[in-house]
Amino acid sequence: MRLHRTNNSRRCTILLILALKIFDFVDTLACYSCIALNYRQNVLSRNDALSPPQNRENLTALFDVLSKNNISHVEVSSSCADVTLTTQPSFLNTPIAICDMNDKCVKMDFYYSGEKVVLRNCLSNLMETVNSPKLKKYCPMYSDDRSEIKVGPMSNVSVCSCQSDLCNSSEKSSVMIYFSIAFILVL
């Protein structure tokens, strides 16, 4: 009987420790943390190989420009790129950053050497100082509302922010939810 109480006591202690860890984790914000050239739009299938493969070596000039403009480095991931409106975004295996709950997730896109670049991260990890006068409050998949911000050789810089877990994705799914709700209401 005494052995049974010891096991129960040990289980309770372990469960309490796990619960405290979970509550501590709830006070954080999860954001996608990646960068990619956006030529994913020209690929037929989401799972098709990208050519040439994206990596730090063939994007050295881009990373140098980001460093010079106090924008932190993030992991290169082809799944970070925006996709066409007819393709469901897939962020499978995309790196995630855990940030303070008071932080924001951001999606930044811009043109560099004629290529569209998409960068996602926590705001505090991305920029040392927030010098963008225009942070949009949601992250749409496509937007004609472009900030006319120029940062070094980066042009048409657009930055959006949001404050819920993994909200800095391509928001096609939320658009589809709105269309579904509208369709149901019409019926």
Swiss-Prot record:
Glycans are attached at N58, N70, N156, N168. One of its GO terms (cellular component) is extracellular region. InterPro entries: QVR-like. The keyword Transmembrane helix does not apply. It comes from the Eukaryota. Residues 1-28 form the signal peptide. Its main location: secreted. It is found in: Secreted. Transmembrane segments: none annotated. GO terms for biological process: regulation of synaptic transmission, cholinergic; sleep. Keywords: Glycoprotein, Secreted, Signal. Pfam families: QVR. This is Uncharacterized protein F46C5.4. It comes from Caenorhabditis elegans.
